[in-house]
Amino acid sequence: MSTQVKPGNWDTAAAITVNEICSQVEQMYSESEDVETQAGLNEEAIELEIENNFDVLVDILFHSEENKVEEALIEQIFFHIACLSMRGYSLNAEKTHGNSAAIIYDTVLGKQRMYGHGNIARFEIPGIAIRLNDKLERLKNLRRWDGPVLFEPMKDTWLDICGYSVIAIMWLREWFLLNLKNQETTGKPTGAK
């Protein structure tokens, strides 16, 4: 899962992360006849698996008595949540995994351009977990009401869950604070004079 590649910018780091997730999703949900694999074809089953993984993550981050939390385990959990949510997005949006990966990449890149590093850097992984909890609760609420609530489509929620998981993986790999590609040469945000 964790790669030895050292990206030079945020864009490349996000692309590497999203492509790893997409490759894993395509392996998990190939044209297999395996009943275990096919169980993941249902959005409700995917949501339940994400919730189970997220509960473990919350216990590790907020209820563990150990001083040193195992970052490799945390990355593994976020990676699994990212795979599951990419699959959920693909099913809900009726897109291929490759098309979903491109949309997820464009979304996280666009959000990074809008928000910068500060919104994640201040609270790090615990902050990402809290944001992810908000999205999981929204997913439950959308399912409870069987559709969009206040114009929030379910596919956007799947996209957000995957996006925050991608960001968490990048943070754990120490890639999140890299400059965007268009900031490499000047060190200034786009449009800065």
Positions of PLM-derived features:
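Intrinsically disordered, low-complexity regulatory regions
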Residues: 2-193
